[in-house]
Each structure stands twice: as C-alpha cells, then as structure tokens.
C-alpha cells in the first residue's frame, strides 16, 4: 500500500523519482526501491516524504485521507470530550469547548454544501 500511495502522490505533485531523491538526499535507485516496495524508508525519511508530498503519514501508510482521520478524531471527541478537549491541567475550559463547537459547526456547513 505504501509504495502505491507514494508513487501516486509523487505523480500528483508532478515530481520525478530523481526530484524526490534529490529532495530526500538519497540516490534515485534508493528512492525507486521505495516505490517498488523492495525497501522501506526509515521514520525520519518517511516524515520528510510526507512533508514533501504534503500528505499525512496515515495516507501514505494506510491510504486514509486526512478527512477520514479528522472524522475519527471528531468521533473520539464526541464520545469522550473531556479526554480529548482537556487543557494541560485536565480542565475543559469554555474556550476549548467554544473552539470545538466552531470546528464542528464549520464541518457541518461544509458537509451540507457538498450534499446539495
């Protein structure tokens, strides 16, 4: 899955394998091995790839879009808001609740627009 997603994202950014290798500071054959699935990047390189291609690690590794990741996090917040919205001292402040409400409201507006 990673190798397929890597190749797809690189092509969407209109980058060559050589471009990617140069940006990562590795040889083209080393980069090509990532796309062929015969070699896996270390964690630092994986993060660099994610940044260069402007995609999440979840998308690169599992094919999950940022929207899917956001939805999963939103479900966690709705199911247990105190855990996910707590400030450092463990208290859920009015400001945190207001910010969460604004985010949810914006997401609902966007969803309604796309449903029309």
Curated annotation (Swiss-Prot):
Annotated SUPFAM superfamilies: lambda repressor-like DNA-binding domains
Highest taxon of the lineage: Bacteria
InterPro entries hit by this protein: Cro/C1-type_HTH, Lambda_DNA-bd_dom_sf
Record GO terms (molecular function): DNA binding
Disulphide linkage map: none
DNA-binding region range list: 17-36
Keywords: DNA-binding, Transcription, Transcription regulation
Protein name stated in the entry: Uncharacterized HTH-type transcriptional regulator YqaE
Native source organism of the sequence: Bacillus subtilis (strain 168)
């Amino acid at each position: 899955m990673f190798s397929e997603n890597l190749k797809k994202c690189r092509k969407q950014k209109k980058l060559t394998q050589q471009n990617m290798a140069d940006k990562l500071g590795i040889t083209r054959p080393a980069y090509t091995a990532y796309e062929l699935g015969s070699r896996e990047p270390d964690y630092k390189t994986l993060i660099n790839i994610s940044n260069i291609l402007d995609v999440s690690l979840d998308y690169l590794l599992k094919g999950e879009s940022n929207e899917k990741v956001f939805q999963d996090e939103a479900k966690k917040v709705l199911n247990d808001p105190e855990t996910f919205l707590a400030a450092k001292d463990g208290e859920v402040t009015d400001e945190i609740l207001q910010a969460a409400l604004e985010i949810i409201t914006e997401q609902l507006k966007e969803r309604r627009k796309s449903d029309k």
